[in-house]
């Protein structure tokens, strides 16, 4: 198609493009990008098409990246080439304050800070993989998330010292939106280092685990929704943890992402929404930029709509 328009194109594999990864086959992480070949081809006037989702380790073996690998490849190349922005096209025209299939007419976000967007993706927003956004944040690359089929509507995701520009609400504190996951495990047990390490080793990283840690117990919320074999992971955890922990399966989680997760006003709005929806959460978890509750899968959509109504559609005023 490029040549039909009068251009000249060349296709390169991930290894040919200088993408170096670790040894985690099928779920490799990009360690470095050395785009010498890409730069030479660009200098020669070629349009360079790079195969995403792949690279090579230091022994020259071909590896494949995990979920979101193509987007991560694009961001990694953009950073290595010194680009200010990476445009990523998909079947949606950017980021919304909730899933349009659950909330009627959610707000379209024109701009979101990359830290808040990483949190949003970790808790279930599907537009971009959290690893892709985190890499863009580290490299200082802005992302334009746009639709392949639509107009110029998009969301700009960028690093900023000021989180407050990530506004869904037009006034008050920034609440990016409400998101959810359908399949999480709750692990409640002895607050020993072995328990936490066992869970992390099985699920593959700290980003999959939320923790509420009272004095002598751990209350871990583990995301297994995107793992290749969640049933096997659950069985392995039951076997390795034994009587030291109680595992609750088939929990849904609903999260708000905000610049002010520790503000009392946000907490009150969160609680009021749950009460209005007649939801008694099984567990509650807090991170720097999010509040999460767990509930039965049947309560998930009702909880999303209630939180969106209380914390996105109405501004949260700090100090009011």
Q: What residues fall within each predicted segment?
A:
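A conserved regulatory-domain signal marking ACT and ACT-like small-molecule sensing domains
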Residues: 156-320
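Hydrophobic anchor at the start of a short beta-strand
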Residues: 8-10, 86, 143, 207-208, ...
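A conserved active-site cap/scaffold subdomain adjacent to cofactor or substrate pockets
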Residues: 118-188
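Nucleotide/pyrophosphate-binding catalytic subdomain
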Residues: 1-133, 225, 285, 289-299, ...
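Alpha-helical scaffold elements within enzyme catalytic domains, especially in hydrolases
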Residues: 1, 119, 135, 198-202, ...
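Structural beta-strand/beta-sheet cores of well-ordered domains, especially the beta-sheet scaffolds
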Residues: 46, 84-86, 118, 131, ...
